[in-house]
A protein has these predicted regions:
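N-terminal secretory signal peptides that target proteins for export/translocation
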Residues: 1-18
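Bacterial N-terminal signal peptides
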Residues: 16-37
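Predominantly soluble domains enriched in secretory-pathway, periplasmic, or organellar proteins
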Residues: 40-371
Length: 371
């Protein structure tokens, strides 16, 4: 009788154990699914560096400024996100470092010493590339982008030390090497395979080409004298680089294989930020001195449209869904929001004094980040 009862109860215990195990597994799966759902449901955001206020956080569903990370005293300028959006890397002009911000809390969790006047940041393949200028004084640009506000004044000095590019390992948060560049390095772009890095050098009218991982120089591309190259972006097919020439009010198309200039296109005054639209069919250029974003055909580079915006609009980003264009306008202390298809204004988001750069999460294309 005992043997019979034993045989009957064992399956029940096994069944109970199995049910408990399945229930626990189901609960775990449900919790993970709920967490994933919650993460997916979180509103997309834009991060905007304001040289006076800090880093503004914009809810892209509501198109409102929801908070500001209080790093304004650091003089934040260039910025870029890590792959999962948990860390925002900001070039801090006044402190000479790279501030690593936890995007959940808004707190600086790491500081990486860079050097004098860090400006531009790009993240690629687990490394952060940060430009800095040992020979420059920094500070917001004078009116008309000239010293003391005098149009046409020349602030270049060939005797100043050239710019440097610090390469930061994002696992250890250490500078693993620093690469000597040209004068007043402005923009950073990478080849399609990520093996080659190109930077624009405003002060000596060149584009420097390097091996991205080692920093070894490959070549220097000389552009038109006095052009002041600033923005740079790779075409979606990987065949060309677009470089804006601020002082000549043009952009050039550089063959990605030969590094020869194959086309020159006129723009309005003072072009800086440049990016292709998410579908690659249009090219957008921020003509900062003309208070205009210009639109060109992404293949022929034929001029398509001029879109009025605010003052000193250097950088911009599309929203993650590609529906809107967000333009950071520093002298208007605001982000201008435009419909990315018909270019109609939607709204202005203020309280961003000396807005400098803008990126989004989920990641989207723009004049700073390209995905």
């Amino acid at each position: 009788m005992l043997e019979t009862r034993f045989r009957i109860r064992t399956p029940q215990r096994s069944l109970a154990f199995a049910v408990t195990t399945v229930t626990a597994a189901a609960a775990t799966a449900f919790t993970l699914a709920l967490a994933a759902s919650t993460a997916c449901a979180a509103a997309p955001v834009a991060y905007v560096t304001s040289e006076k206020a800090g880093v503004g956080v914009i809810d892209l569903d509501q198109m409102t400024l929801t908070k500001t990370f209080p790093v304004g005293a650091d003089g934040p300028r260039g910025l870029s996100l890590n792959a999962d959006g948990t860390r925002l890397l900001v070039a801090s002009k006044n402190t000479g470092d790279l501030a690593v911000i936890d995007t959940a809390s808004g707190q600086v969790v790491q500081r990486v010493k860079i050097g004098k006047n860090p400006e531009y940041v790009r993240v690629r393949n687990g490394y952060a590339y940060v430009t800095y200028e040992p020979g420059e004084e920094g500070g917001p640009p004078a009116a008309n982008n000239a010293p003391n506000g005098k149009p046409g004044a020349d602030d270049d000095d060939a005797n100043k030390p050239p710019a440097e590019i610090a390469i930061v390992d994002m696992k250890t948060w250490r500078v693993i090497r620093s690469v000597t560049s040209g004068h007043e390095t402005e923009g950073i772009e990478f080849s399609r395979d990520g093996h080659t890095m190109l930077v624009t050098n405003e002060g000596d009218d060149t584009v420097s080409v390097y091996h991205a991982r080692t920093g070894a120089p490959v070549r220097t591309v000389k552009l038109a004298a006095g052009g002041r190259p600033r923005g740079i972006r790779l075409s979606p097919d990987g065949k060309d680089y677009i470089v804006t020439l601020e002082s000549l009010s043009k952009f050039v198309v550089i063959d990605a294989h030969t590094f020869q200039v194959v086309k020159t296109v006129d723009t309005k005054l003072g072009p800086y930020g440049v990016a292709f639209g998410p579908d690659g069919k249009r090219l957008f250029v921020a003509a900062a001195r003309d208070k205009t974003v210009q639109v060109f055909d992404g293949h022929s580079y034929e001029h398509l449209a001029d879109v009025p915006v605010g003052q000193r609009c250097w950088h911009f980003s599309f929203t993650p869904d590609g529906a809107k264009l967000l333009v950071a306008c520093g002298r208007s202390d605001a982000v201008y929001v435009l419909d990315a298809q018909n270019y109609q204004p939607i709204r202005q988001i203020g309280e961003l004094p000396l807005a400098w750069g803008i990126v989004t999460y989920p990641h989207s294309d723009g004049s700073i980040e390209s995905h």
